[in-house]
Amino acid sequence: EINYIWSSHEHPDHFSTGTLKSIDENIRSKITVLYQSTKDKKVINFCKGLGFKTQELPNKKNIMLNDDFNLICGKSGFYDSWLYLTDKYNTLLNINDCHIDTLKDLEKINKDLGNEKIDILLSQFSYAAWRGNKNDSLLREQEAKNKIRILERQLENIKPKYFIPFASYI
């Protein structure tokens, strides 16, 4: 049973209109789409138009979904967002595609979350966009090494119990 769907941002590899449309119309009204607050409300209005319940997530505000389940959604860059989930047993932080790369960025997100211990971290394990032509192997290798350095910095500073490499099979 699906109760909630969250999308980090509007790009089609994260927010799939086809997938949402493929969900049976009879159960859409039982599912709440969670999405960061935006000025244009385009995603929220689209989902409402399909018959989903919707809930906008204000930036960095704790939202209690039920007695045992909370979340915080934070904006990252111009259009992306991260998601922090807690229940009475675990904490999970999804920072996939977010530019949380520097020590300063990591200190800020730790502060935003009250320096809570993260049990599970989801983060991108490789670069996700075009990095040179076929013959630019050195550039792609440098980008991959840079992404690994960023990932190491994230793991050293967030110190999750578990890490789930996420997305980006380039």
What do these predicted regions represent?
Residues 7-10, 29, 47-50, 58-62, ...:
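Short linear motifs at secondary-structure transitions and domain/linker junctions
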Residues 1, 56-128:
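Core dinuclear metal-dependent hydrolase active-site scaffold
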Residues 10-15, 39-43, 62-64, 78-80, ...:
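Active-site environment of divalent metal-dependent phosphoester hydrolases
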Residues 2-5, 40-47, 66-73, 129-134, ...:
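Low-complexity, flexible helical/coil segments
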Residues 13, 90, 161:
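Glycine-centered loop/turn positions within well-structured domains
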Residues 1-59:
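Active-site HxH/HxHxD metal-binding segment of metal-dependent hydrolases
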